[in-house]
Amino acid sequence: VTMALINNSVKRSSFEFVDKAVNDIALKSGDAGFVCDILLVSPDAGAYKKVFEYGEKLNLSVMGAMKHRDKDGKITLMFTHDVEGKDCLIVDDLCDGGYTFELLGKALKEHKARKVYLYVSHGLFSKGFEKLYEIIDHIYCTNSIKDISGYEFTTTVGVINTNDYVTQYKVI
């Protein structure tokens, strides 16, 4: 059974989900019909290549946040773009506790970003949503780990149903 599942699995790019998030942000900001001034934000060096690729496909600017964790675990964030008045979409593959996104969202707002959104492919949200809710304007996430559609600052548009992409198997 395991080999059949592996052989018949489908690799999905998160690009289509990020594209849905960008379109939803454009609709919410009243910029439907053309892409608004959204800045894609990579939260760390590990995600930058993928986020840059998405930026090229969507014709959007990309900013890489540089995250440094010192020996005591304190995180310092630096970024190079002017974010004043921009809608910023942080893009990453996984959110566990959300501390990095909390810090990055706070830094973006301190630098006068208009709105801060978060897209993650897989959301554990092990520390809950309370801190993120204070900073992040909207979260987009698949339901690959957890269904977040019932929360106030998420919508069914922002929750991508991975069940649509899973093939049903009958074990004989």
Regions found by a protein language model. Give the residues of each.
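PRPP-associated nucleotide enzymes
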Residues: 1-172
